[in-house]
Amino acid sequence: MSEAVGIVVALQANYLEVELDQAPEQGLSRLLCTRRTRLSHRGETVHVGDRVRVEAIDPVQARAVVSGVEPRCSWLTRPQVANVSLVVVALAVDQPAFDPDQASRFLLTAERTGLPVQLLLTKGDLMEEHQRFALVERLMGWGYDSLVVSSQTGEGVEVLSQRLKDTELAVLCGPSGVGKSSVLNCLMPHLALRVGAVSGRLQRGRHTTRHVELFPIAPGSRVADTPGFNRPDLPDDPSELGMLFPELRVQLSPWPCRFRDCLHRQEPGCGINREWERFEFYKDALQECSDLSRPSRAG
């Protein structure tokens, strides 16, 4: 076999791991690859999740060279993953404590992809049942049907497993320390992914996942584990923000405002009901977006 097609399942430094659609008669189905120089010359980047063509296959050494990248159907910039079909935002109910502003930032980032979003509440065993119910109801008001899981008790793991098995490529993202790797260990115990504790004073997790990697959860279905980070950026364009809030989005169709450039703060002719929990966060986010989009006067 001189050429083949596969998917990039991991990327570190100058090397890519590619899992072939069809393994060679002799050798492994996963190859350690470099990139052809011409890809860089053409400005073609290669990321985890990309469908690629490989050549110069050495089945004995399990080596090859990536010679081309297939067109992408979707693209996430942070974390950088291609061809995603579901974004799973993982947030802990405690340790670290649930932070509504941080949660909103992650959800806005997920909504910007235009892909389906699943909200996952981890460490469910750390909160009393009535508190969890209240949190789930609160997030329902945000427009999200949350799934509560616990890597300690196994609660919700089977439901999550089925959700992921019905998806071609799901990306699991969220703040550091919310237990993403622990959840994946429950789903696929053979992975034995490294996990870490949450630091005490700042209540932030330590980065135990260092790079993006795809894991097969069922034939034709993969899930991406990603490094955690704690403060996603907001959009540069303030006019983009409103459609990223599901509870506001339902009020925007059909358009209820007098002017097409209404930002739904308190402008004349605005037809939006302001009695929703995240309205204050929305206004603060609008201000931040406006500051980002304003040209700098620094010389």
Curated annotation (Swiss-Prot):
Q: Does the keyword Metal-binding apply?
A: yes
Q: Which cofactor does it need?
A: Zn(2+)
What's its top-level EC category?
A: hydrolase
Organism of origin: Parasynechococcus marenigrum (strain WH8102)
Record-linked NCBIfam families: ribosome small subunit-dependent GTPase A
Name recorded for this polypeptide: Small ribosomal subunit biogenesis GTPase RsgA
How are cofactors bound according to the entry's free-text note?
A: Binds 1 zinc ion per subunit.
Provide the binding site for GTP.
122-125, 174-182
State the family it belongs to. Answer: Belongs to the TRAFAC class YlqF/YawG GTPase family. RsgA subfamily.
Q: List where in the cell it is found.
A: Cytoplasm
Keyword field: Cytoplasm, GTP-binding, Hydrolase, Metal-binding, Nucleotide-binding, Ribosome biogenesis, RNA-binding, rRNA-binding, Zinc
The record's section on InterPro entries has: G_CP_dom, NA-bd_OB-fold, P-loop_NTPase, Ribosome_biogen_GTPase_RsgA, RsgA_GTPase_dom
Transmembrane stretches in the record are none
